[in-house]
C-alpha cells in the first residue's frame, strides 16, 4: 500500500512540476 501512495504522490508532483517547467521555458524563449 505505501508504495502505491508514494507512486501516486510522484505522479502528482510530476504533473505539477512539468507544466511549470514548460511555462518557464516558453517565457525564456519569448524574452
UniProtKB/Swiss-Prot annotation:
The 4 large subunits of the cytochrome b6-f complex are cytochrome b6, subunit IV (17 kDa polypeptide, PetD), cytochrome f and the Rieske protein, while the 4 small subunits are PetG, PetL, PetM and PetN. The complex functions as a dimer. The keyword Cell division does not apply. Its main location: plastid. It holds the Pfam family PetL. One of its GO terms (molecular function) is electron transporter, transferring electrons within cytochrome b6/f complex of photosystem II activity. It comes from the Eukaryota. Belongs to the PetL family. Keywords: Chloroplast, Electron transport, Membrane, Photosynthesis, Plastid, Thylakoid, Transmembrane, Transmembrane helix, Transport. It is a single-pass membrane protein. The chain crosses the membrane at residues 4-26. It is found in: Plastid, Chloroplast thylakoid membrane. Disulfide bonds: none annotated. Component of the cytochrome b6-f complex, which mediates electron transfer between photosystem II (PSII) and photosystem I (PSI), cyclic electron flow around PSI, and state transitions. PetL is important for photoautotrophic growth as well as for electron transfer efficiency and stability of the cytochrome b6-f complex. GO terms for cellular component: chloroplast thylakoid membrane; cytochrome b6f complex. InterPro entries: Cyt_b6/f_cplx_su6. GO terms for biological process: photosynthesis. This is Cytochrome b6-f complex subunit 6.
Amino acid at each position: 500500500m505505501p508504495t502505491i501512495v508514494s507512486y501516486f504522490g510522484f505522479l502528482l508532483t510530476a504533473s505539477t512540476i512539468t507544466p511549470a517547467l514548460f511555462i518557464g521555458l516558453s517565457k525564456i524563449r519569448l524574452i
